[in-house]
Amino acid sequence: MKKLLLLLILLIFAAKVTAEEWAGADEKAEEVIKELKPDYEPWFSPIFEPPSGEIESMLFSLQAAIGSLIIGYFLGYYRGLKHARNA
């Protein structure tokens, strides 16, 4: 019951937070660099630049989903090993 309540509180909090608060660290760092040194030239350019923000968001979500699947698989695998040893 406590886990469900905590999850509901977390979901309500996430729904109330604005998009600006979820901005990426690289965007915030870029703003700070431009303020401190406006003539700064980046030494690296991306290999692939997504054509739109929606595609960039989709690729980020896909990356997060794949990472979550891998972590979930190994957590389940080791939990299964633990239960098999105790049986």
Curated annotation (Swiss-Prot):
GO terms for biological process: cobalamin biosynthetic process. Pathway: Cofactor biosynthesis; adenosylcobalamin biosynthesis. Its main location: membrane. It comes from the Archaea. One of its GO terms (cellular component) is plasma membrane. The chain crosses the membrane at residues 4-24, 58-78. The keyword Cell membrane applies. Part of the energy-coupling factor (ECF) transporter complex CbiMNOQ involved in cobalt import. This is Cobalt transport protein CbiN. It comes from Archaeoglobus fulgidus (strain ATCC 49558 / DSM 4304 / JCM 9628 / NBRC 100126 / VC-16). The lineage of its organism: Archaea, Methanobacteriati, Methanobacteriota, Archaeoglobi, Archaeoglobales.
